């Protein structure tokens, strides 16, 4: 009985429309240049001189975390790739979205009585809980994007799919680079002196895509 009520409560009971599901994933990938640009900006931020010791500690922690992640993503076969895709993309997509978007976000919206404020408070908590100061801004923005996917559709499958696409592209790119099929990382999109047009195009497509998603979602929410 409890299990039967769990799916409706988490907004997973309704099958997601195929075109919208792929649209949510595409929107996640479309904003890669913007996310990478904000990540580069965030990583170059500095704390006040009085907090230099804290900044050095935070940077050391994030460098160590990046090294662990890089070592973790060393894949030596298709089996390793599929396992990493499950661990890094599938599990976090379901776990984090069901916690933050399906459960916490509606509570925040009811608490503050403002959907937009509730979405961004949830996005703040989503980014904060990762404990990566120099990656806070891009993760905060991603959290807001995922929040609006859920708010517009009232269906958890869309933020889950977008979250999977975000993490999955990192695993897939790492796999393709290691096998020689890809020469450059998607993390470099939107970075560099001539990358402004990538960010501008990314922003325009994201705004248009979210307008389309909101309009199409009205028929299923």
Where do the model's predicted regions map?
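Functionally important transmembrane alpha-helices
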Residues: 127-131, 135-189
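Small-polar-interrupted transmembrane alpha-helices in polytopic inner-membrane proteins
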Residues: 88, 92, 115-130
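Transmembrane alpha-helical segments in integral membrane proteins
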Residues: 1-3, 80-108, 205-216
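Membrane-interface helix/loop boundary segments of multi-pass membrane proteins
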Residues: 95-121, 151-154
